[in-house]
């Protein structure tokens, strides 16, 4: 693995290897490679709290040097292309680029670069490190993916998390279902759409998605009713009470309390939302460690 662009390019062996590596970092049973002479640049063209901060901590724990880059003060504001920006960073010595961009599959225009790229989210396309940290969180609970019933609820069409998790969970043997308003369904994903109330008592993992108003048409935003959405697709206390004893709740965050999930359930006993955030730092350590070790081995 010399880049991480999409979950569809990861095989199951690579997924398990990354989970095991991240778990070893988390448990103090592994030491990262020696990367004090390596440089990383984080290019975030969309707002981010968890992902950006998580990558920053992961990079610092690995000993990488950070190239200061802020999109608001970069030459992108003067019209420089994404390719030229990344090529510049490659030429001045960056060893890996972490990129979040509003353009889906932005990385297609970077294929001629000779530098590893980690996709931190591309429009409504993919979010591979979020999927990996979700998989790590699930694996900590069940030690398997085979046969698990996963319900992904919400704005499926506009969610890169839904697409990445659908691909990876299906490949690992889980049964994925969606629950979504008609206008937010993604028919390209070959999983059944179900009524949340008809399946809630047999679900192992409830994965809630943020309503992504920033990707909606104006008419969708103005017609959106919080109470109606929460009643039809949100995790309410009554639905929580029907969950299996070992079922867990997940959400990629940021969480809109009272919309996707009842406020009091965000830190309920079955919730793993904040554990996901913790695991994110370790999975990103594992991804960067693996990519740079692969790059080093290739260079020898």
Curated annotation (Swiss-Prot):
Residues annotated for L-aspartate binding in this entry: 78, 160, 210
Transmembrane feature ranges: none
Pathway(s) per entry: Pyrimidine metabolism; UMP biosynthesis via de novo pathway; (S)-dihydroorotate from bicarbonate: step 2/3
Catalytic reaction(s) noted: carbamoyl phosphate + L-aspartate = N-carbamoyl-L-aspartate + phosphate + H(+)
Keyword presence, Cytoplasm: no
Transcription keyword on record: no
EC numbers: 2.1.3.2
Keywords of the record: Pyrimidine biosynthesis, Transferase
A Pfam family of this chain: OTCace_N
Molecular function, one GO term: amino acid binding
Any one Gene Ontology BP term: 'de novo' UMP biosynthetic process
Enzyme superclass (EC): transferase
Top-rank lineage group of the source organism: Bacteria
Binding positions (carbamoyl phosphate): 50-51, 100, 127, 130, 253-254
GO cellular component entries: cytosol
Role this protein plays: Catalyzes the condensation of carbamoyl phosphate and aspartate to form carbamoyl aspartate and inorganic phosphate, the committed step in the de novo pyrimidine nucleotide biosynthesis pathway.
Family: Belongs to the aspartate/ornithine carbamoyltransferase superfamily. ATCase family.
Subunit-level organization: Heterododecamer (2C3:3R2) of six catalytic PyrB chains organized as two trimers (C3), and six regulatory PyrI chains organized as three dimers (R2).
PANTHER family: ASPARTATE CARBAMOYLTRANSFERASE, ORNITHINE CARBAMOYLTRANSFERASE, MITOCHONDRIAL
Name this protein carries in UniProt: Aspartate carbamoyltransferase catalytic subunit
The species this protein was found in: Staphylococcus saprophyticus subsp. saprophyticus (strain ATCC 15305 / DSM 20229 / NCIMB 8711 / NCTC 7292 / S-41)
Name of the gene: pyrB
């Amino acid at each position: 693995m010399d880049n991480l662009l999409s979950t569809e390019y990861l095989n199951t062996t690579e997924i398990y290897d990354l989970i095991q590596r991240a778990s070893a970092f988390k448990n103090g049973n592994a030491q990262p490679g020696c990367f004090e002479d390596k440089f990383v640049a984080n290019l975030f063209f969309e707002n981010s709290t968890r992902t950006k901060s998580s990558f920053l901590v992961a990079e610092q724990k690995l000993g990488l040097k950070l190239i200061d880059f802020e999109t608001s003060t970069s030459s992108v504001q003067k019209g420089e292309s994404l390719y030229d920006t990344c090529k510049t960073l490659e030429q001045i010595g960056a060893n890996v680029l972490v990129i979040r961009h509003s353009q889906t599959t932005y990385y297609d225009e970077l294929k001629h670069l000779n530098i590893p790229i980690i996709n931190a989210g591309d429009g409504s396309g993919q979010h591979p490190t979020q999927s990996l940290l979700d998989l790590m969180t699930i694996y900590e609970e069940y030690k398997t993916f085979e046969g698990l019933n996963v319900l992904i609820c919400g704005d499926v069409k506009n969610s890169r998390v839904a697409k990445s998790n659908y691909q990876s969970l299906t490949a690992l043997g889980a049964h994925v279902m969606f629950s979504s308003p008609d206008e937010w369904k993604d028919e390209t994903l070959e999983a059944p759409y179900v009524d949340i109330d008809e399946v809630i008592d047999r679900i192992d993992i409830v994965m809630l998605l943020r309503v992504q108003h920033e990707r909606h048409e104006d008419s969708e935003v103005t017609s959106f009713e919080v109470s109606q959405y929460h009643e039809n697709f949100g995790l309410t206390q009554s639905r929580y009470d029907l969950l299996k004893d070992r079922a867990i709740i997940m959400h990629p965050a940021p969480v809109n309390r009272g919309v996707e999930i009842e406020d009091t359930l965000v830190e309920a006993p079955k919730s793993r939302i904040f554990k996901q955030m913790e695991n994110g730092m370790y999975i990103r350590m594992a991804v960067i460690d693996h990519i740079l070790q692969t790059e080093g081995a290739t260079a020898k």
